């Protein structure tokens, strides 16, 4: 299952047992694990305050492309306008569902699903 679909599923119900079962089902998803790690690790910061929501659909953004750009932000190789431009480039590639429900939430460090 795609990570943003998993997040949407987690958002759909407030039950702790439901959330545990969804996470248990998808425990072996490496992309989900890496995304959760980036998002929930307090020592990982991206150095950006604002991450816009997407209203347009791109072709789709694969995880490796996002991850390599995120590492540039984490390592502070992209700061200021360069960081903003990097994020806008990523946003233009991703579908609005991918961006708003997965990649953007990692960058703002809030999955908004009660995990």
Predicted ranges, named:
Residues 1-115:
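N-terminal nucleic-acid-engaging modules of covalent nucleotidyltransferase systems
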């Amino acid at each position: 299952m795609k990570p943003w679909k998993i997040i949407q599923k987690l958002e759909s119900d407030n039950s702790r047992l439901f959330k545990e079962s969804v996470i248990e089902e998808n425990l072996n998803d490496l992309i989900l694990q890496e995304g959760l790690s980036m998002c929930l690790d307090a020592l990982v910061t991206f150095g950006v305050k604002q991450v816009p929501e997407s209203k347009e659909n791109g072709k789709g953004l694969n995880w490796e492309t996002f991850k390599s750009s995120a590492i540039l932000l984490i390592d502070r190789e992209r700061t200021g306008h360069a960081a903003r431009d990097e994020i806008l480039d990523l946003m233009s590639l991703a579908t609005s569902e991918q961006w708003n429900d997965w990649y953007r939430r990692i960058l703002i460090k809030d999955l908004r699903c009660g995990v």
